[in-house]
Each structure stands twice: as C-alpha cells, then as structure tokens.
C-alpha cells in the first residue's frame, strides 16, 4: 500500500511580506513597535470581517486562550469547563492555570465536535463554560449545541485557531459564542508570524480582557465608568497603578501586522 502524505502546514510568509516589514522598520521617525495604531486598525478590521463588536489582539492563539479563561475567572471564582480531548494543549492548560476543573467530553466522528448526548450528561451546576474547538477548518457548531448552551445558561467559548473563515448557517464561526479565539501562527490560514485575537460582543468581558492583556492594569480599560468604579473602591491606591488581578504581558508587537 502506498503511503499517503498530506502536509498539515507550510510557511506562508513570502518575500513580499519580508520587504513590507523592512520598509516599515526603515521609516523616520522609527514607528511605535508595540500595541500602536496598527493594532487598533487590525482589531477593527477583524471585527468588521467576523461580525463582533469587541476584538483584542494578543501575542499568540495560546495567549488568547489563557487570557479568555483568566477573564472568565473574574466572572466565576471556580467551577468546571467542558472541552474535547481533540484540541490543542493551550485550551486545557488555560483552564488549569485559572483553577477551573477541566471536564473532557468525547467527540463525534462527523464534525469532530462534541458527542452531544455525552455532553448533556456532563453538565452540572458547576459548569461555567463549554470550550468548543473547530478542528482543521471543520465547523463544530450545531443548532442543538447552541440550544444546550442557551437552555443551561452556559457560556460557549469558540476556539477558531485553525478554522478562519469557516461558516455555519451563513455566519462565520467565532461569531456565535460568548467569546472566540483565533491564532495567527505562521502556518495558519492567515498569519502575523505570531499572534492571536479575542472576539466578543460583551463589553464588560472585553474591558476585563483589556486590563489583563497588560498585567491587569485597569488604566488599559477604555470604559471610564468601569475604570472609575474600581478606582473609587480603592481610594488608597494610585489610580495609574491599580491591577485588577495577577496577569501577564499578552501584548502583540506591531511588527507582526505589517
């Protein structure tokens, strides 16, 4: 029997991309190289393409996963997150890092998404989110899955790191869940060499993510009333150095967006 080989990925960075980056770096004065206007421009363009109101660029898809679950921990102190065994390790590790309990649900072989009969049996009062992975460009959504989330008041998180542009009922996946994550790793459908983005229609969740992207600093929040509420609750602290909770630097280098 002949061996069949289908490459999973190839480097999609070409000479034109490299030259564009060189020209950007050769500007005078030297452009801002981290979290500048190009990042905001990209976030807005991505939101228009996907159909989500709030979009936050980070330095990798893995960081998008970790930051999403860290922000979820601001909404719920503990609980369980259901996820498939067929996923990338960062989905699982992000749940563990934020001290949620990962609960694994087997997949079906039709779309490599959850076996919904098994999923229903795993839902408990402690279930905080269902973390879906769209595998290799295959849509993992069904009406039944969306109804399960709605009926049980459970957040749906979509991992779309390897399924950019996949659709379900005429809408792009990543626009259905409470929040979705994309990766722009060098071998994915669209690349910034390294990078990722968090997408949601929930402003409070977005503002939490904004703070946590930069060590947890609330001065990164753009919603003044949310920021002032935290400042007023901490009158003894310098308002420029109030941190929502322990976090990391998830910011993206602007060079990746050229």
Q: How would you name each of these model-derived features?
A:
Residues 1-32, 244:
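N-terminal "arm"/small-domain region of PLP-dependent enzymes with the aminotransferase-like
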Residues 32-33, 37-80, 94-96, 104-106, ...:
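Phosphate-binding glycine-rich loop
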Residues 50, 76, 125, 174-175, ...:
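Structured loop/turn residues at beta-strand edges in well-structured enzyme cores
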Residues 57, 83, 198:
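Conserved SAM-binding loop
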Residues 73-160, 167:
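PLP-dependent aminotransferase-like
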Residues 163-169, 176-258:
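Active-site region of PLP-dependent enzymes
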């Amino acid at each position: 029997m002949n061996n069949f080989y289908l490459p999973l990925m190839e480097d999609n960075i070409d000479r034109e991309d490299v030259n564009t980056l060189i020209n950007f770096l050769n500007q005078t004065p030297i452009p801002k190289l981290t979290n500048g206007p190009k990042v905001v421009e990209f976030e807005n363009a991505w939101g228009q393409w996907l159909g989500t109101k709030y979009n936050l660029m980070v330095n990798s898809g893995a960081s998008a996963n970790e930051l999403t679950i860290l922000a979820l921990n601001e909404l719920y102190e503990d609980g369980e997150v259901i996820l498939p065994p067929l996923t990338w390790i960062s989905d699982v590790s992000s749940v563990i890092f934020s001290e949620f309990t990962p609960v694994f649900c087997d997949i079906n072989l039709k779309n490599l998404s959850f076996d919904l009969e098994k999923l229903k049996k795993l839902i408990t009062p402690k279930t905080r989110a269902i973390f879906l992975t769209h595998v290799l460009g295959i849509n993992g959504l069904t009406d039944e899955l969306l109804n399960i989330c709605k009926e049980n008041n459970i957040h749906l998180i979509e991992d779309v790191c390897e399924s950019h542009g996949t659709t379900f009922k005429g809408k792009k996946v990543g626009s259905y869940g409470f929040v979705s994550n994309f990766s722009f790793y060098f071998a994915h459908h669209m690349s910034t060499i390294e990078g990722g983005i968090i997408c949601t229609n929930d402003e409070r969740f977005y503002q939490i993510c904004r703070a946590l992207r930069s060590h947890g600093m609330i001065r990164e929040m753009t919603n003044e009333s949310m920021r002032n509420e935290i400042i007023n609750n901490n009158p003894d602290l310098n308002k420029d150095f109030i941190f929502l909770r322990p976090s990391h630097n998830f910011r993206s280098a602007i060079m990746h967006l050229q």
